[in-house]
Amino acid sequence: MPYTVRANDQGNVRVVCPATEREYAPEELVASILRKLVDDASTYLGEPVEAAVITVPAYFNDAQRQATRDAGRLAGISVERILNEPTAAALAYGFDRSTVKRVLVFDLGGGTFDVSVLRIAQGVFDVKATSGDTQLGGNDWDRRIVDWLADAFQAEHSIDLRRDRQALQRLTEAAEKAKIELSGVQSTPISLPFIATGADGPLHIETTLERSVFESLCPDLLDRLLRPVQRALRDSGLAAEDIDDVVLVGGSTRMPMVQQMVRTLIPLEPCQSVNPDEVVAIGAAVQAGILTGELRDLMLNDVTPLSLGLETIGGVMKVLIPRNTPIPVRKSDVFSTSEPNQSSVEVHVLQGERQMAEGNKSLGRFRLSGIPPAPRGVPQVQVSFDIDANGLLQVSATDRTTGRQQSVSIQGGSNLSEEEIKQLIEEAEQKATEDRRRKAEIDRRNRALTLVAQAERRLRDAADRKSTRLNSSHVS
């Protein structure tokens, strides 16, 4: 990555940008992209876009979903729904509503991988199971080519190109280009002139990558794709032969090795009638139509991708909401104190599939105080988990004796506090006003320059015509 990524004083991620001489939270960077999309859409539609459906990888945890919602707020839009990408893809395809279909959606993007199993009948889309890997995507295939090129170059010239940022960027671009080309041909040339300088002058890369060689570099990546598919099928209670349709989503599914792996696992020809790069956006538009009431004959029932629970005595995770539970959902359980006369309890909210708390994602902590003195195990504290249709979690704890309650919307994984979000929104609004003013000035200046240029051109044309008439009169 050409930018420095570090942790600030609170341990949150910050990206250092030398050009602007400031640090950015990931939410700010995503907000910039969303703002550009909103501006382009508003220009195209001729009216302001104020709300949106945003898709995310199905295996995003609560913290990542909350960060996505925060990015939408920073961009100045109301996030009406956060939709899982495989579910969006299924909505885009629609499928025949006269029959019951069991569909597997295989979504391999640039940086994440998701797989979902749905039951579709009479316009009702029921997500039965979802699985995935948020650290696996097409970029991993790119890196295999980068390493192949860099290792060969280092063996020949004793120079590691991965230590040079500019050289690494060129390698990465060439690797992605080669990966894309190998989806349609058996071999592709790779040319990188002046990639480095040796003792005798400039050095170059001139080589050819065969598809078979590329595939030999990636067997472990295919294995990592296989496991989530098997898990999703197992969680849905279906076998591979029970699947009626397979939908491929994401540009990385164009790789022949990926398509062949899917065919081997599920002996069906995948549906490819919609562009895999566009199908998720189309599904998001369908979901927006459902929310606005323009599409009344469709219903979507999604699930939570990971188990949710809290830490109990001994560091064990107690699951309240198992993975693949349909959402929205509310689940409660009763807990007690671990010490005599304990006046407060800390609720540590977790997400993940490990039995021990330390192996799972910590979403946040809060404390319920004011518990009356009592022997260990006597007080009763009811803890409730609420997940909304966006997959976002709210947790509450209530002392049954006093009725005292403490609740919190989990934001433990967000990189921005509520105060920071409000400040950034105000800054964005101020900058938006300034940007509009500057754009208006530039537009006026450009129009003036255009008018001046047109006037000068007309004057020249008039002078040329007058000169031509004078010359004609002189000749005659």
Predicted regions and their residues:
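Oxyanion-binding/catalytic loops of NTP- or PPi-dependent enzymes
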Residues: M1-G11, V16-E27, S32, D39-R469, ...
